[in-house]
Amino acid sequence: MSLYEYNDPIINKDLAQADPVMGQNRTFPTLEAWYDVINDYEFQSRCPIILKNSHKTKHFTFACHLKSCPFKILLSHQGPVSVQNGDGSPGVGVGDEHGHHHHHNMHAHHHHHHQNGHTNGHGNSGDDVSEQEAQQDDEDDDAAVTAAIAAAVAAVADSQETIKGPFAVTKIEPYHNHPLESNLSLQRFVLTKIPKILQVDLKFDAILESLCNDEDNTVAKFRVAQYVEESGIIDIIKQRYGLTDAEMDKKMLSNIARRVTTDKARFVLKRKKEGVYMLPNGHQISGADQHQHQLQHQHQHQHQHQHQHQHQHQSQDQHQNQHQQHVGNDNHVYQDRIHSQSDQDEAGVHNLDDNNVRVAAAAAAAAAAALQSRDSHVSEELKLNCGTGQDEDGIEDDNHSSKRQLHRSDRDRVAEALKMATRDILSNQNVDSDVNVDVDLVTGHKQLSPHDDMAEQLRLLSSHLKEVEAEENVSDSNLKKDDVQDENIQPELRGQ
């Protein structure tokens, strides 16, 4: 970052160092004497220097109007503070510009017209840059304007009394991060000084205060354009900063009027915060009445807040009642849905019972057919065996094995029929259990369901199958008894 030091015989690095001849820092007998120096510096460089802060009228910090610029000066009081009015409130030093400005009129005019080396050379280049800046927004220096308004108001509040010194610069950083050529034009520099002129020279707030007292605490009759023409602000600017009639064109007058409007708006806002703006004078008798008005305003605000709070509670109660009604309606709808679903499930249960009856009947018929087929086959074979009376060992063995296979196949068919019937019934029962109905709603249907009849039929079929197996075992044992072992056959018959 490039840094620039503007040439000045006083504002430089040596200002914070001891004078080799006198052996001490350069001092200023009053704060007004210091403002003579700093105002001349900012006028020549077209760079506004603002008062950043002050501490108990003993320490003052000045800085460049650009926030990013490192330029800074710390001015400190070197002895006991002596103020003519005894007021040691902060910001007194700014008010001393009032006396200085009258002294500075001819002084600044002298610099503007007769300093050809430093000021005019850089001023021309600054004017060239200003022609380009004219196309930009006129509010680029709003920060400087705001700071100037605050400083000027503080100056008026603390009157014109001079703070006696001595004062000395204890710290200085005289370098800027912007070249002299890029600084403000003379017109734009003057615009940054309008708030100070309004407050210090023209006592702008006092004028508005008087107008409020005469017009029921309003400034509605105040006309900015008329004030700019008749207040004398144009003459002050011309004399103090050397502007010509050509430089005071319409655009310049419009910008001055905008600054006046800004300061007027600040005053109105302050009165509104105090609660007295637009309040008739008959109601503003004393400070106690003003306090009472503020209390009434606060009470009205609290009452309005309570009313809003009650309205909010009523809205919440109404919303809750609507919600409960909505929930009740939902419950009725839900109960209707349950009853309709129960009716549908009742019909489904009857259908499932009919299906189970049909499946059980089919299974029983299949099992009975299988048993009947087996009995017929057994009777036919017994008749055939009795009629033929075959005594040969090979034929008897074949008949015995064929009977076993026949019994086994019949038993398998019956068992398979029972398994199929059982599987179908279980599948239908699963479907029945999957129906999404209440248990209590279907208990009556299950009591009247013919599942018990189906179970009874299956038990009968199972017991009948066991009897058949028992008969097969008895027949097998009888056949085994009829068989004669080889060792029991007489030897003389073995060869036959």
From Swiss-Prot:
One of the GO biological process terms: chromatin remodeling
Gene Ontology MF, one: DNA binding
Biased composition (Acidic residues): 128-143
Modified residues (Phosphoserine): 402
Keywords, alphabetical: Activator, DNA damage, DNA repair, DNA replication, DNA-binding, Nucleus, Phosphoprotein, Transcription, Transcription regulation
Compositional bias ranges of the Low complexity kind: 313-326
Protein's job: General regulatory factor (GRF) that contributes to transcriptional activation of a large number of genes, as well as to DNA replication, silencing and telomere structure. Involved in the transcription activation of a subset of ribosomal protein genes. Binds the ARS-elements found in many promoters. Binds to the sequence 5'-TCN(7)ACG-3'.
Protein name: ARS-binding factor 1
Gene behind this protein: ABF1
